[in-house]
């Protein structure tokens, strides 16, 4: 590999507030906020970033919160969300795409609770949705990958073929080809948000096929670690993963949810919450 070019730049998404009002004009006592996580918190990744936002929310608002991690996208998610609502959580954040239908179902039984779902597309009378235009960061990291590759083969470890993941894949290769028309992208699907073993295996396969820059849409650090082990480059996702690949890690698109969580809870407390759809980005 040649000496790394000075193109690396941390990319971040600061989610703007979702203007959300359950009981129009009536302030609400918010004693606890619930968070549902699809993977373990760990110390990097999608869930880790949401948990950082939760902690920031507690510190800024004085409202306590609780979470349940590693909740599967199925009937167990419905049970966890329902239990949070039954115990009186006035705001519940469900942070994975597959929770959407389960949260919508529960929301109809608890009209005085604010339900907020990440990355989905269905809304209800008291259920809003939020996401970020992650593809914007993907494009920029693709530019870096396109400049850094020597083999012109890029590798992508992906979870599920849902719109958000496909957007990221398309943006990444478009960014790469904007500076390197010869760049090609190979994708391996692991059908899991968090499976370090599969993520590592997919990374090794991609590198054996000639990929010298890897990225991922999964929740562990396995891809960055595999690239470090093999002397290749990697682009992190969700978090700064440079400590897992001091030589490999070029840059990362990082997610920052604290401002969104703070403003959402404050709006519920003030009584001016209403369910809306947020899709934040750079503009």
What does each of the following model-derived ranges do?
Residues 13-23:
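Bacterial N-terminal signal peptides
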Residues 2-15:
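Bacterial N-terminal signal peptides that target proteins for export
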Residues 23-29:
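Sec/Tat signal peptide C-region and signal peptidase I cleavage site
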Residues 29-283:
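A residue-level marker of the well-folded mature domains of exported/periplasmic proteins
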């Amino acid at each position: 590999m040649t000496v790394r070019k000075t193109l690396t730049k941390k990319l971040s998404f600061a989610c703007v507030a979702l203007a959300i009002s359950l009981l129009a004009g009536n302030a609400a006592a918010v004693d606890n906020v619930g968070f549902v996580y699809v993977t373990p918190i760990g110390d990097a990744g999608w869930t880790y970033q949401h948990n950082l936002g939760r902690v920031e929310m507690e510190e800024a608002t004085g409202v306590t919160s609780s979470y349940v991690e590693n909740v599967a996208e199925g009937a167990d998610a419905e049970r966890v969300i329902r239990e949070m609502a039954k115990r009186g959580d006035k705001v519940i954040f469900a942070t994975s795409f597959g929770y959407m239908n389960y949260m919508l179902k529960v929301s109809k039984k608890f009209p005085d609770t604010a339900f907020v779902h990440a990355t989905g597309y269905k809304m209800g009378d008291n259920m809003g949705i939020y996401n970020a235009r992650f593809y914007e960061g993907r494009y920029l990291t693709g530019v870096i990958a396109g400049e850094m590759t020597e083999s012109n083969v890029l590798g992508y470890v992906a979870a599920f073929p849902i719109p958000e993941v496909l957007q990221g894949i398309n943006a990444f290769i478009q960014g790469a080809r904007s500076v390197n028309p010869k760049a090609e992208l190979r994708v391996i699907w692991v059908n899991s948000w968090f499976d370090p073993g599969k993520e590592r295996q997919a990374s090794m396969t991609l590198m054996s096929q000639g990929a010298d820059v890897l990225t991922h849409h999964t929740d562990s650090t396995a891809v960055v670690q595999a690239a470090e082990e093999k002397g290749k480059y990697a682009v992190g996702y969700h978090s700064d993963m440079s400590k897992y690949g001091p030589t490999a890690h070029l840059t990362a698109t990082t997610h920052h949810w604290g401002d969104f969580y703070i403003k959402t809870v404050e709006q519920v407390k003030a009584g001016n919450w209403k369910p809306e759809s947020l899709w934040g980005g750079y503009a």
